[in-house]
Each structure stands twice: as C-alpha cells, then as structure tokens.
Amino acid sequence: MRKLSKIFLLALFVTVAMAQTPEPPLSDTRLTIHTLVREDIFAGFLSNDTGRLSRGEKNVQLLLEKRPAAKAELLAWQAGTSMYRAVSAYEDNRNDDFQKYYKQALDQFAQARQNDKSGGGVDAVTGGVYAVFGDRLPKEYRAAAWAQAYDSFQTLWKLQGPAVDKLPVHLRGELLGGLAMSAMRTGRTEEAGKYVDKILALLGNTPYESVAKKWKDNPKTIENTSIACLTCHESGRLNARLTALNSAK
C-alpha cells in the first residue's frame, strides 16, 4: 500500500508539473525548434524531470515530420536525450542499458552531422550535451566526448566569435565556458586560460565571472569543475518568447 501511495504521489507531482508548463505550440513557425524543445529537455538534463523530458522527446519526433528542414538539429536533440539516458543508466549500474543508449546517442550525433547543411545548430547542441554529460561518462569514454565537445565549440567560435560581445549573456557564457572547459579537458591549458580571460572581460557581474575567477586563481580546477548551464535554462523562457513575439505584432 505504501509503495502504491508513493507511485500515486509521483504521478500526481508529474501531472501538476506538466500542467504548470503548457504544451509547446509546435505549429507556431515563428519559434525555432530549439525554443520549442529546449525547456522540456533541459528539465530532464538538469532536474531529472523525466515527464518533461519524455514530452520533449515526443515533440522532437513530431517536429521531424513538421519541419524536415530542421532534421539535423532535431537529430542532435535526440542524441542528447539518448546521452542523458545513457548516463542515468551508468550511474544506476545498468551497464547493458548504458551501452544501448550510448551507442544510440553516437549514431544520432553522426546522423545529425551528416544531415547538417547550415552549421551552428548541431554543434551548439552537441557541445552543450557533452559539456553537461562528458564528466559523467565512464572514464574510458570521456576523452572522446571532450574531443567532440572541443571540435563543436571551435566551430561555434568561428561562427560567433567575431560578435561574441554582442551575444546574449547566456549564449556568450555557454560559448566561452564551453571553449575553456573543452580546451582544458583535451590538454590545451594555455588556450583554456585565454578563454578564461575572455570570460572575465566579457561576462562581469554574471555567474560565469565568479567561476572564471576561481579558475584564474587556480587553473587546475578547470579540470574538475563546470561552468555549463549557469543561466537561462529555467522554466518560462518559451512563454516569455511567445509574449515578446505577440507584443511585436
């Protein structure tokens, strides 16, 4: 009876949480696929909200039908959810499930790169996923994960670096933070230090600055601390974006 009560309470909690986060309007073409799925998927990544993660996965699948031009980016998001499930399985000592989901994630990332025609979107998702989960993979997989993260952030830097000071704080912080973390974890210590200096110069009075100061004081700490996802993955961004679009009519 107690077990059934716990299951009921969990189901009730998930139902209430989902009710507080309205279904993303997939038919609204003013919104990018990233805006439509990011909030639900990161609720899974950062808070283990499996209900919202599942909704994000479902919406990715629906968007593959509705927006075929965004196939590459959507496949990258699918890879991200598979990587989350792989890491969760590893941390629960379910090795068979880990191997299944990890291989699935790698295959989906490969498909995303094969279908990528525009550049940027796939690398943003790829770099972000590995920045969140790279250190949580089994040790033997971490070097490859961070090598891929480094390549993805380098591609983003070529695209966004010239105007990095004009990016929103979240994008600026995640880009520079990802560059610093991936450089350090792939043995590029001097390069990592340059990105830390850029964070200090361009992200004053933000959560990124406080982490970068610690890194500056002791560069070795970059090896085992994270700066990923410090801002703007909270609920409400989708609604805020919709409100802004509707107000601009």
Residue ranges and their predicted role:
Residues 6-16:
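Bacterial N-terminal signal peptides
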Residues 17-21:
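Boundary at the C-terminal end of the N-terminal hydrophobic targeting segment
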Residues 23-28, 32, 36-58, 81-113, ...:
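Short coil/linker segments at helix-helix boundaries
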Residues 25-27, 61-76, 109-122, 157-169, ...:
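Flexible helix-coil transition and linker loops at the boundaries of alpha-helical arrays
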Residues 76, 83, 124-128, 177-178:
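Conserved alpha-helical positions within TPR/SEL1-like repeat arrays
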Residues 180-181, 185, 200-221:
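Sequence context of c-type cytochrome heme-c attachment sites
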Residues 222, 242-249:
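Short cysteine/histidine-rich metal-coordination sites, predominantly Zn2+-binding motifs
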Residues 225-236:
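The canonical Cys-X-X-Cys-His
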